[in-house]
Regions:
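Walker B catalytic acidic pair
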Residues: 238-239
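Conserved beta-strand scaffold positions in the cores of enzyme catalytic domains, especially
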Residues: 17, 115-118, 286-288, 299
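C-terminal lobe/lid and adjacent interdomain/linker elements of RecA-like ASCE P-loop ATPase modules
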Residues: 251-358
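Phosphate-coordinating catalytic segments in nucleotide- and nucleic-acid-processing enzymes
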Residues: 45-230, 317-326, 338-358
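Pre-Walker A-like glycine/lysine-rich segment at the N-terminus of P-loop NTPase domains
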Residues: 1-47, 53-65
Length: 358
């Protein structure tokens, strides 16, 4: 399990350290560096490649050495730490670092701890038919391959397939059944057989995945990945609330918590823009990011917010909405009294619409 990650000169992150728990949700404005944290973790799980550095430089500048440091612990509680990437951003490739590939360094436990999958789903990709091959099914970053993953689960593990459908119905009650059919595809003078996702929804049969909402497909992709035999130890979810009604967001979070309880080695790191979803989190599970005036990322736990009087009174999403992100830019050494100069809203200035009964 990962306990922390530190990014230096990685995209907008000049020097950012983030503590990670079993469930960590990153929030903040667009472009504040949330997705970059997920991408950095994903980069650790595979041998470093030259092409991986094409998108790292910030604004095309030479910003020095890029370094990603991680720390965690094994299942037996033994801690570990490692500097995983250390290469000039715009210079020549450094190819003599065995720690760039954990398997080459001979640390199998370390490699297992970084079984991470990044999901940045695209509705069109998730709905796409998937050509049937002998290759083991794999859910790609965009969600492509979902039909193959579901078909394999249906054919080889009926219990998991039924559990998947039950979990999806808990999030999207209108879905009565998930189906996978074979379909002959004609494309550029060639033909092949593909798996195609269909849904029974509210009494209607065989609704194509292409007509389903992106939120439904997202929920299916997340739950299929976590119910499959290929379940990763670390699931990285970009925009976990995308296309989901607030109640569906809460219900999806409930399913994720059940899976975290069921699988002690599972860890989830996600990004979100939804105060409704954040309302169902503990402040310790929320990391707030923003950009400083110089364009670099700043990050702090919501538990570090300057309004201690609001902690424990407002839900996490309400607290985030009330105080915003500017406080994250403040130096850790600035006192609470000094931070009051920012004059965040008091409880009396928060409208009743922001406060819900617990």
């Amino acid at each position: 399990m990962l306990d922390s990650i530190r990014l230096q000169n990685f995209k907008t992150h000049r020097d950012t350290e983030i503590k990670l728990g079993r469930l960590t949700v990153l929030v903040g404005p667009n472009g504040s560096g949330k997705s970059s944290v997920l991408q950095a973790i994903e980069l650790l799980r595979q041998p470093a490649k030259r092409s991986a550095y094409k998108s790292i430089a910030r604004h095309g500048e030479v910003v020095g050495e890029c370094e990603i440091q991680i720390a965690g612990h094994h299942a037996n509680g033994k801690p570990w730490s490692r500097t995983s990437i250390d290469a000039p951003l715009m210079g020549s490739w450094v190819g003599n670092r065995p720690d760039l590939d954990p398997t080459q360094a001979g640390t199998k436990e370390f490699d297992a701890s970084l079984q991470a999958v990044l999901l940045m789903p695209d509705p069109e990709s998730m709905a796409a038919p998937v050509r049937i091959t002998d290759v083991s099914p794999q859910l790609h970053r965009s969600g492509w391959g979902l039909a193959d993953v579901v078909a394999t689960m249906r054919d080889n593990d009926d219990d998991s397939f039924q559990a998947l459908q039950d979990a999806l119905r808990a999030v999207v009650p209108q879905v009565e059944r998930v189906k996978v059919q074979r379909q002959l595809i004609t494309e550029d003078f060639s033909k092949y057989v593909a798996y195609r996702l269909l849904f029974d929804v509210a009494g209607r049969k065989d609704i194509p995945a292409s007509t389903m909402s992106g939120g439904t497909l997202l929920a299916l992709a997340i739950l299929a990945l976590l119910h499959s035999p290929q379940r990763p130890r670390i699931l990285l979810l970009d925009d976990i609330d995308h296309g989901l009604h607030p109640k569906a967001q809460w219900d999806l979070l409930k399913q994720l918590r059940r899976l975290l309880e069921r699988f002690p080695d599972l860890q989830i790191v996600a990004t979100s823009h939804s105060p409704d979803l954040v309302d169902e989190l503990d402040p310790s599970e929320v990391i707030v990011l923003t950009l400083r005036e110089d364009g670099t990322s700043a990050a702090k736990s919501l538990t570090e917010c300057p309004r201690e009087d609001m902690l424990g009174v407002l839900k996490a999403g309400q607290l985030w909405s009330a105080i915003g992100e500017d406080w994250v830019k403040a130096d850790h050494r600035v006192s609470y009294r000094d931070r009051r100069a920012h004059r965040p809203p008091t409880l009396s200035t928060i409208s009743a619409s922001h406060v819900q009964d617990p």
